[in-house]
Each structure stands twice: as structure tokens, then as C-alpha cells.
Amino acid sequence: MLELLFVIGFFVMLMVTGVSLLGIIAALVVATAIMFLGGMLALMIKLLPWLLLAIAVVWVIKAIKAPKVPKYQRYDRWRY
């Protein structure tokens, strides 16, 4: 809701100052893109602890459930 009020206020202020309609539309597109990128950055920062937790859980599960290779099937011996 606050974003909508910002866009409407931005539009009105550009009209009052005498900017052309094409300039207003261009400014609204640029402002929308900047607000979108800012929102995505804020969301990424907000979710970062959960993403790190998910990575840690996967790492622990892979460490616990590592495939056990029998000694006779290892491929680290010399080949002739």
C-alpha cells in the first residue's frame, strides 16, 4: 500500500513540475525497476540465514550418509 502511495505521489509531483507524459512514464518505469531490485535484495538478505541453514543441513546429511566403499573396490591402488 505504501509503495502505491509513493508511485501516485511521484506521478503527481512530476506532473505538477511540468514534466512531459513520456518523461513521467520513463521515470515510473525506472523507479519501479529500482524498487523491484531493492525489494529482491531485501528479501535475499532476509532469507540468507535460512539458506545457510539449509546448506549446513545438506552438508551434515551428506557427511553422515557417505557411501561406504569396501576396501577391495577402491581404485587408489597402482595399475600395471
From Swiss-Prot:
Biological processes annotated in GO: phage shock
Protein's organism: Escherichia coli (strain K12)
Pfam family, one: Phageshock_PspG
Single GO cellular component term: plasma membrane
Name by which UniProt lists this protein: Phage shock protein G
Record membrane topology: Multi-pass membrane protein
Keywords on record: Cell inner membrane, Cell membrane, Membrane, Stress response, Transmembrane, Transmembrane helix
Keyword NAD: no
Keyword Hydrolase: no
Induction: Up-regulated in response to filamentous phage secretin protein IV. Induced by PspF and negatively regulated by PspA.
UniProt superkingdom: Bacteria
Localization (cell): Cell inner membrane
Residue ranges crossing the lipid bilayer per the database entry: 5-25, 41-61
Task of the protein: Effector of the phage shock response.
